[in-house]
């Protein structure tokens, strides 16, 4: 269970260039007047006149981070954190996230935007946040209500998965950890043993756990994290 809860990835408290679509279409622009073929051929020979089509310069169509964020959130909406998405849909999410991370600020680990309360809206491995509770069997008995990560300055991380058991019993599984910056993008969090609350019952179990996360994007709305085993996490800031 410790490994379970610990998988709730942390886009640390301190947290892959621009989308450019090039137009290679060539436009044939009409001449303003016609030249008789014989005259044209004659002049071409004498003057080396070359008549060719004019190609338009490449035009950059840029998709900004706001558009990418909207697209990303629409792709993961109502997916139970990614559980209901098909393999193809997971690929689409990864592609959009890959474009968005090109806009990441430098040294996201040091950016104060990483602090605050975040909702885990997607994970490429849906069982990572919440562990066994979100496995195929676990979902038969436990419904995930929300997955929250709070990052408090300067170095405290709190993960909480709220669940409903058997349709009538509410509970929480939470982790509290200490955040450490490894470099400008990677952080490490060492968590205390998980704590579970079910009704009036509250207890700790298991052992300490550790996770490492690379912050690949952060702004006022969204944060992206990449786990050490390749799991992609999407965090949306809570209002």
UniProtKB/Swiss-Prot annotation:
Localization (cell): Plastid, Chloroplast
Origin: domain of life: Eukaryota
InterPro entries registered for this protein in UniProt: PAP, PAP/fibrillin_dom
Keyword Oxidoreductase: no
Keywords assigned by UniProt, alphabetized: Acetylation, Chloroplast, Plastid, Transit peptide
SS bond list: none
Transit peptide: 1-52
GO cellular component: chloroplast; chloroplast envelope; chloroplast thylakoid; plastid; plastoglobule; thylakoid
Pfam families reported for this sequence: PAP_fibrillin
Residues recorded with modification N-acetylserine: 53
Family statement drawn from the similarity comment of this UniProt entry: Belongs to the PAP/fibrillin family.
Protein's name according to its UniProt entry: Probable plastid-lipid-associated protein 8, chloroplastic
Organism: Arabidopsis thaliana
């Amino acid at each position: 269970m410790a490994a379970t809860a610990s998988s709730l990835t942390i886009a640390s408290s301190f947290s892959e260039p621009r989308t450019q679509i090039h137009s290679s279409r060539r436009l044939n622009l009409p001449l303003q007047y016609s030249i008789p073929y014989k005259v044209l051929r004659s002049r071409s020979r004498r003057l080396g006149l070359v008549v060719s089509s004019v190609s338009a310069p490449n035009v950059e169509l840029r998709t900004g981070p706001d558009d990418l964020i909207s697209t990303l959130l629409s792709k993961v909406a109502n997916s139970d954190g990614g559980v209901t998405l098909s393999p193809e849909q997971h690929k689409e999410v990864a592609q959009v996230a890959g474009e968005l991370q090109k806009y990441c600020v430098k040294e996201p680990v040091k950016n104060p935007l990483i602090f605050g309360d975040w909702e885990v809206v997607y994970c490429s491995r849906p069982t990572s946040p919440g562990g066994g509770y979100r496995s195929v069997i676990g979902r038969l008995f436990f419904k995930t209500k929300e997955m929250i990560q709070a990052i408090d300055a300067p170095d405290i991380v709190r993960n909480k998965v709220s669940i409903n058991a058997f349709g009538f019993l509410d509970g929480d599984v939470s982790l509290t950890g200490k955040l450490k910056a490894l470099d400008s993008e990677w952080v490490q969090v060492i968590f205390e043993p998980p704590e579970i609350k079910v009704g009036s019952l509250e207890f700790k179990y298991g052992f300490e756990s550790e996770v490492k996360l690379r912050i690949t994007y952060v702004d006022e709305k969204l944060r992206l994290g990449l786990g050490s085993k390749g799991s992609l996490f999407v965090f949306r800031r809570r209002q």
